[in-house]
């Protein structure tokens, strides 16, 4: 084998190893690439109970029920499908029916999503109340800043028990 053939063999072998490594990494990260799954995606992919993922959609109107010990149940909808959610903890300030939400947790054996983290989504015009008040006090407030809103992450790591 000549020197040129050995060099080409080494380059070709290195490219094959690199391609295999890239395929393995992409396969391992396949489920993490999507920030959240919608209720339709959950039903189409038949996610196994206990598998952690993020669920996103709108809190369905009329579905919010506050129980004892900070337990809250609601339904997340994407317009086509709906998934029941149970969460134990303090909800974000912006959490309300009809508002966008991303919850992290897992499905239980009965098909209820048990969330341990809930994020309320907001639009790009968000401004914390404290900042808006400070701007108004200093005379720098502009009416085109939009409505005052806030998004706060709530994490109830103690879990949900029923």
From Swiss-Prot:
Heme binds at residues 122, 126. Pfam families: CcmE. It is found in: Cell inner membrane. Residues 138-162 are annotated as: Disordered. Its main location: membrane. It comes from the Bacteria. Gene3D superfamilies: Nucleic acid-binding proteins (2.40.50.140). Keywords: Cell inner membrane, Cell membrane, Cytochrome c-type biogenesis, Heme, Iron, Membrane, Metal-binding, Signal-anchor, Transmembrane, Transmembrane helix. One of its GO terms (cellular component) is plasma membrane. It is a single-pass type II membrane protein. Residues 1-7 are cytoplasmic. NCBIfam families: PRK13254.1-1, PRK13254.1-3, PRK13254.1-5. Belongs to the CcmE/CycJ family. Heme chaperone required for the biogenesis of c-type cytochromes. Transiently binds heme delivered by CcmC and transfers the heme to apo-cytochromes in a process facilitated by CcmF and CcmH. This is Cytochrome c-type biogenesis protein CcmE. It comes from Nitrobacter hamburgensis (strain DSM 10229 / NCIMB 13809 / X14). The lineage of its organism: Bacteria, Pseudomonadati, Pseudomonadota, Alphaproteobacteria, Hyphomicrobiales.
